[in-house]
From Swiss-Prot:
Residues 25-110, 173-200 are cytoplasmic. The gene is get1. Belongs to the WRB/GET1 family. The chain crosses the membrane at residues 5-24, 111-131, 156-172. It comes from the Eukaryota. GO terms for biological process: tail-anchored membrane protein insertion into ER membrane. This is Protein get1. It comes from Talaromyces stipitatus (strain ATCC 10500 / CBS 375.48 / QM 6759 / NRRL 1006). Residues 45-97 form a coiled coil. The keyword Transmembrane helix applies. Interacts with get3.
Amino acid sequence: MISFLLLIFLIQLAIYIVNTIGASTVDDLLWILYLRLPSSISKDARKHGELKRDVVQLKREMNATSSQDEFAKWAKLRRRHDKAMEEYEAMNRSMGSRKTSFQYSVKIARWLTLNGPRLFIQFYYTKTPVFDLPPGWFPYPVEWILSFPRAPLGTVSIQVWSSACATAISLTGNVVIAALQKSGQASMRQAQAIPAGKSE
């Protein structure tokens, strides 16, 4: 079985990755993938896209037609455009409500898969130590804090280990992001450098 050390670290890493990427980005990606599945909603999504293209095409044709010189053609295009626009708006409302309910379901599933196991482990194994501290290395107050809230004295509790993992992952992520940004800025400066032969 996987150790508590690694399990809690992986849970905190998954939470950090989802929070860094952004929950809305993950939701949008899952929505796109969901629309690719063979289902009735994917058919509706294709119809929604076709209606949008039809509305745009009719609007272009209507704008290209003079309402004064070719009134009959323009009026016919206008009626077709209005009908297509009405269908598109109804389909857009329907797709919007479906997307909202899908995102709500994804939000619940994300919370249950990320925070649910973390909370379950922290409450169910609250008296179980993650690892033992070497005897005599730390004074009593430090041992008490590290075993907080209910782990045996002289051990590290799951809550403390979870907090330590979250902090370490967050700090490491910030360092990596800062290093990537700095290297990106340096490469941009090199690309924008003025050639030696030119003067300002």
